[in-house]
Regions:
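Glycine-rich acyl-CoA binding loop
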Residues: 106-122
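Non-catalytic substrate-recognition and accessory regions of acyl/acetyltransferase enzymes
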Residues: 1-105, 123-135, 143-146
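Active-site beta-loop-alpha junctions enriched in small/polar residues
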Residues: 139
Length: 146
């Protein structure tokens, strides 16, 4: 598996991105966290920008990191994490989605893609002056200290 990361998705991958975000077959496992996140931040939506597709959450300006498998023929993402700065000291992760093949019991599970995406946000957060913690909403507001 050859995973790379980007903040944009090609426009032609809209339906695959929507499937990943909104119709993920494993989302029932974190249903309560999703409901909490939606109540707190609003609904995610796919938006077209001049450089491709991104994800917006409610009225918030969110950052999005997409994972792509270079070994796949498709340009569609295999994972996504949405995060935003909620205060001077905090970044929240309201949404994470991983293609079923890359989930814990999937055929490509060895990459630990969900954990890798959260770790990437942790790397980014550690470079932002003042940020001291990341709050992950899918697991009863897990707090990751930096």
């Amino acid at each position: 598996v050859n995973i790379v990361f980007s903040s944009r998705v090609p426009r032609e991958c809209r339906s695959e991105l929507e499937d990943l975000l909104f119709f993920n077959p494993r989302q029932h496992r974190v249903r309560d966290g999703i409901i909490d996140s939606l109540a707190h931040f609003g609904h995610p939506r796919v938006e077209e920008t001049s450089s491709g597709l991104s994800v917006r959450v409610g009225d918030h300006e969110a950052q999005t990191l997409f994972a792509f498998d270079r070994d796949k023929k498709t340009k569609a993402p295999v994972g996504v994490v949405v995060f935003l700065r909620t205060s001077a000291e905090e970044i929240a992760i309201p949404h994470v989605a991983v293609d079923d093949e890359y989930a814990l019991q999937g055929s490509e599970a060895g990459v630990g893609l969900g954990v890798t995406l959260v770790e990437k946000v942790k790397e980014i957060a550690s470079r932002i002056v003042g940020v001291k913690r990341i709050v992950f909403f899918y697991r009863q507001e897990v707090v990751i200290r930096l």
